[in-house]
Amino acid sequence: MTDLTLAALKTAPLAQVRQYLLHLLATHAYKEGDFILSSGQPSTYYINGKLVTLRAEGALAIGRLLLTELPDQVEAVAGLTLGADPIVSAVSTVSAYEEKPVVALIIRKEAKGHGTKAYIEGPELAPGTKVVVLEDVVTTGKSAMLAVERLRNAGYQVDTVISLVDRQQGGREFYQSQGLTFQALFTIGDIQQVYRQK
């Protein structure tokens, strides 16, 4: 099912929510053309996840799906600004409705130049707190790895990275080489298949 109202999206079975989100990504976020990725690599397609993650219905679907993917005892989700900001917020908000509260943390690329000069925005958590890093799109894996390193340097335990989309260009293998578990809701092939059926 690719057409759900917001009311239905709140309670629809997760398999339907997953198909709905896949349709949103293929319809609104996926573009073909000539692009340069943040990794510096050229590409014939681009996924602008924010065109879905910043929609109310996209955020709700993402929050519901990713919350169910979190390992046990996870107390927080985090991600590198800007792409992960709406994702961690969506998961945290849905977690409150599900009565399984998860804190959202936002990781800066550069330390704030004023005030606390912090790399990590959000509530301060106890050392050893289990945190999962969330990402919109993974290519090489280097962007989310910066978030992992910042969190570990702050004393948090990070073992898992979860992405909405895996471009299948080495990110999974990179995370495995770093001792991290990696999951993605969709592969680029999933999105391209739906895109080409439009």
Curated annotation (Swiss-Prot):
HAMAP family: PyrE
Domain of life: Bacteria
Regions that span the bilayer: none
Enzyme Commission identifier(s): 2.4.2.10
Record key words, sorted: Glycosyltransferase, Magnesium, Pyrimidine biosynthesis, Transferase
Name of the protein in its database record: Orotate phosphoribosyltransferase
Family statement drawn from the similarity comment of this UniProt entry: Belongs to the purine/pyrimidine phosphoribosyltransferase family. PyrE subfamily.
Molecular function terms from GO: magnesium ion binding; orotate phosphoribosyltransferase activity
Positions with a binding annotation for orotate: 139, 167
Binding positions (5-phospho-alpha-D-ribose 1-diphosphate): 108-109, 112, 114, 135-143
Entries under PROSITE patterns matching the protein: PUR_PYR_PR_TRANSFER (PS00103)
InterPro entries the UniProt entry points to: OPRT, Or_phspho_trans_dom, PRibTrfase_dom, PRTase-like
Quaternary structure and partners: Homodimer.
GO biological process terms held by the UniProt record: 'de novo' UMP biosynthetic process; pyrimidine nucleobase biosynthetic process; UMP biosynthetic process
Catalytic activity: orotidine 5'-phosphate + diphosphate = orotate + 5-phospho-alpha-D-ribose 1-diphosphate
Cofactor: Mg(2+)
Keyword Magnesium part of the UniProt annotation: yes
Organism encoding this protein: Synechocystis sp. (strain ATCC 27184 / PCC 6803 / Kazusa)
Keyword Transferase found: yes
